[in-house]
């Protein structure tokens, strides 16, 4: 993992601020070629060009899922923008990303991108672009969230791993170096057949991902990752989860040295 810090950016709070700015500030036309803040679905900052300089990656668009009981109402975009990272701190005040700050604009309408992250998943020392997409797969002909990983080479996305799915359908996943070995793992919130949820940890194994361990079933509705509480990495990894139906907060502890969850 090189010159990277994915800030696990949980976008909603920042996007709410952007929306309020759009509503209450005097409206001026968005400059030609710029991208409105209201069209930002997801963003993160990380070095994806292996030059030691971070970029701002943005999913932009206006789609909304309507045909999925688990993901109904969630947004997806049409474009991946690779931008000057200096603009990240000004997104809420500017109301848009200036055209001159956009290095590349990549059309991803065909795979309905929902979330973008950056991390080194295979230990090659280069950060991959992780995109959660909403689409069918060759051997799984239903619309579902799927984790896709790419290298960014001269403005083009080169596939690294286009997984049909994880072990189970998932609500969300983040990249996090759970065992502090310099390589990022997938941490996902997944559906059980009984309607419950578990948190599962995956690591890269040659040509794909393998489950390291998982939590016991979580008790509570709509768990989500807690980005406000620091997570711990190492032989003992700690991951925080919040629930939408209460102020309940769970700190999950994984003993990775003994491979026990």
Where are these regions (language model features)?
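Beta-propeller-forming repeat regions
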Residues: 4-261
